Amino acid sequence: MDISAGIQASLAGRYASALFELAAEEGVVTAVESDLDKLHAALGESDDLKAVTNNPEISRKDQASAIEGVAGVLGLSPLTTKFLGTLAANRRLSKLGDMIRAFRTIAAAQRGEVTADVVSAHPLKDDQLESLKTKLTAREGRTVKLSPTVDPDLLGGLVVTIGSKRIDGSIRTRLNTLANAMKG
């Protein structure tokens, strides 16, 4: 398995690698990736779920019960549900977001894809996303999967991160650069 040492070196990477290997053995990588996408969306939408995963004062038992309930509501696969139970038992739910990102990276690498994190000041339209995807695919020489997010603090423009490469075309960065240049 060709997984970068950087991913495996982190705690989140080790858990993600283990989950990927189990999913690959069972032939359910796509299902687990879909489960993790649902879970990632739920984490973004629910402050209560964030609190359950990040609050160290919540007991392991209560975290496990809450996560099991969430898994049932979201209709997650048995492997993903068991994985989340393991995270709760080991007090690692706070690293869930990092584990999801690491799993996506590993799965994409296995498919010969690369993920581009795209941050914009406003939601991008489908045609804008498709155009960006086409240009990034041509630039990278392999299939690019976009992971768009919105950050109003950018004011305008985009910040695209692919692996360790960053393309920052945000107005915020341009204004900061101009302000620093004016300081002398």
From Swiss-Prot:
Q: Which residues form a coiled coil?
A: none
Q: Which Pfam families match?
A: OSCP
Alphabetical keyword list: ATP synthesis, Cell inner membrane, Cell membrane, CF(1), Hydrogen ion transport, Ion transport, Membrane, Transport
Keyword Cell inner membrane among UniProt keywords: yes
Instruction: Tell me what topology the record assigns in the membrane.
Output: Peripheral membrane protein
Molecular function GO labels: proton-transporting ATP synthase activity, rotational mechanism
| Principal location class | membrane
**Locations listed in the record:** Cell inner membrane
| Origin superkingdom | Bacteria
Which Gene Ontology terms of cellular component type are present?
Answer: plasma membrane; proton-transporting ATP synthase complex
- State if Phosphoprotein is listed as a keyword: no
Q: Which residues cross the membrane?
A: none
| Quaternary context | F-type ATPases have 2 components, F(1) - the catalytic core - and F(0) - the membrane proton channel. F(1) has five subunits: alpha(3), beta(3), gamma(1), delta(1), epsilon(1). CF(0) has four main subunits: a(1), b(1), b'(1) and c(10-14). The alpha and beta chains form an alternating ring which encloses part of the gamma chain. F(1) is attached to F(0) by a central stalk formed by the gamma and epsilon chains, while a peripheral stalk is formed by the delta, b and b' chains.
User: Which family does the UniProt entry place this protein in?
Assistant: Belongs to the ATPase delta chain family.
- What is the stated purpose of this protein? F(1)F(0) ATP synthase produces ATP from ADP in the presence of a proton or sodium gradient. F-type ATPases consist of two structural domains, F(1) containing the extramembraneous catalytic core and F(0) containing the membrane proton channel, linked together by a central stalk and a peripheral stalk. During catalysis, ATP synthesis in the catalytic domain of F(1) is coupled via a rotary mechanism of the central stalk subunits to proton translocation. This protein is part of the stalk that links CF(0) to CF(1). It either transmits conformational changes from CF(0) to CF(1) or is implicated in proton conduction.
- Put simply, this protein is called ATP synthase subunit delta
Q: What is the lineage of its organism?
A: Bacteria, Pseudomonadati, Pseudomonadota, Alphaproteobacteria, Sphingomonadales
